[in-house]
């Protein structure tokens, strides 16, 4: 095994559990391999299946030492464009892109040719948004060969320099800066401030 690649993440919680297990294995067995990770954007709103934005996704896993982070499967090259660009600007590590060969047709096949896909990816290459390119659904060795040829003489992405700030996330990202106002998180779970919440905790009614 040369590296590990938890990929096509729909739910960031699953990926975090996977990365935790990998980290524990490395520690327990005194080994280390490079780890890549990727996410899938499931619709044109730019969110994962569980509702996270690209920036929120990155904030959720940025504590783990990764070789790269990227977008995989997804909506095809053209509709991935804004999310690949965004990830390139916020991740201070290598970025990757493994698109489908367009969207599937009504028969479950893919109509986009290797040349068409490679031509669309030229935009990503010329803008230096990616360090690693590949393919996902619908791609074959012919597609990978066309992508490789398109990328052969292009300069790789320069890794972004990101200001060191506290970056949190739920479905949306939250960045705390020196000039941020006072921020209170989880005040509704304060047993001293809410009689209702205190009663639920005392009675073990955690699902209420």
Regions found by a protein language model. Name each.
Residues 1-208:
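Domain-level signal for soluble alpha/beta catalytic cores
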């Amino acid at each position: 095994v040369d590296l590990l690649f938890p990929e096509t993440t729909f739910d960031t919680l699953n990926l975090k559990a996977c990365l935790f297990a990998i980290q524990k294995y490395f520690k327990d067995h005194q080994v280390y391999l490079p780890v890549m990770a990727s996410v899938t954007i499931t619709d044109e709103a730019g969110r994962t299946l569980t509702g996270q934005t690209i920036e929120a996704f990155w904030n959720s896993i940025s504590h783990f030492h990764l070789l790269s982070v990227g977008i995989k499967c997804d909506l095809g090259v053209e509709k991935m464009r804004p999310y690949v660009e965004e990830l390139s600007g916020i991740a201070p590590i290598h970025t990757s892109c493994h698109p489908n060969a367009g969207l599937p047709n009504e028969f479950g096949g893919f109509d986009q040719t290797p040349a068409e896909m490679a031509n669309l990816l030229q935009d990503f290459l010329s803008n230096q948004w990616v360090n690693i390119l590949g393919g996902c659904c619908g791609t074959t060795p012919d597609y990978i060969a066309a992508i490789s040829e398109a990328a052969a003489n292009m300069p790789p992405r320069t890794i972004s320099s990101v200001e060191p700030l506290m970056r949190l996330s739920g479905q949306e990202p939250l960045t705390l800066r020196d000039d941020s106002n006072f921020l209170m998180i989880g005040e509704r779970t304060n047993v001293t401030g809410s009689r209702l919440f205190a009663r639920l905790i005392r009675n073990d009614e955690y699902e209420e």
